[in-house]
Amino acid sequence: YDALPNSLPRVGGIITSVVQTPLSHVNLRAIQDNVPNAYIANPLSNDAIASLLNGYIYYKVESDQYEIREATLAEVNDWYEDLRPTETQYPIRNLSITEIIPLDDITFDMSSSFGAKCSNLATMRSFGFPEGTIPNGFGIPFYFYDEFMQYNNFYEEAQVIMDNPAFQNDINFRNERLEDFRRSIKDAPMPQWMLDELQAMHDAFPSETPVRVRSSTNNEDLPGFSGAGLYTSKTQYPDEGHISKSVKQVYASMWNFRAYEERDFYRIDHFGAAMGLLCHPNFQGEQSNGVGISID
């Protein structure tokens, strides 16, 4: 690539041949993952870099210079083990809220049930911005994802998938098997009560409104772990039928290859991970978009 995709999986270092923006998804991922990242003009024309292709490298980036050389396998293994937590991490997952709630009724401390993205945006609606600055909408709690997964026995299926030695040791097999699993999630049925509640939420939006269904998990937008680009958001257009289509597409993204690899590296319990949803009118005619990072 000249410009790396936002869906970049875990890597040991990044070089781009085009200038990056400080708040690009790629740069945010590099900061979060503590990996070196630099723009280097015409890197493959540089023999000192090109000669290292397909081998282990030592790569260090400072504000005005970089160092790159061949590395030993021991150096590589030591580097990654130093980055990983030593114990399994269990993200907070509160399933006590069992209903879809308007954003104006969701508070900051309800992130344990809706995810930080949803609760943060809901809280911003109380900041006094001009009407329309922060979109109105609804939050769908983790409870819905958990009930959907249990209804289809997907937790058990995921465990069987993960226990397969080929899945654990073959990255291509793992990628393909996760793709199959996501397809199963998208095609799976929902209990009728869930379909009814999703339809009631959808009907509450003005007629013909495209609704943006955004991921809001308990393992992104957290202190020290942004999760930028790991999960997928979808827009439900008026001619697409029941909004469960988009909901299931976002639920399936919990098992994106890049998301699975990131959780696995950080030893985050896959079955404690939960998907909340932030639903609001889709932004129309936007001139640009990006990521905002506060000083705290």
What are these model-predicted stretches?
Residues 1-43:
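Extracellular/luminal Protease-associated
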Residues 28-34, 126-128, 295:
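Alpha-helix C-terminal capping segments
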Residues 1, 41-278, 287:
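N-terminal beta-alpha lobe that positions the nucleotide/phosphoryl donor
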Residues 232, 281, 291-296:
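Short beta-strand elements
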Residues 18, 217, 281-283:
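Short, flexible loop/turn elements at secondary-structure junctions
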Residues 12-16, 113, 280:
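Glycine- and other small-residue-rich loops at beta-strand/loop junctions that grip anionic moieties
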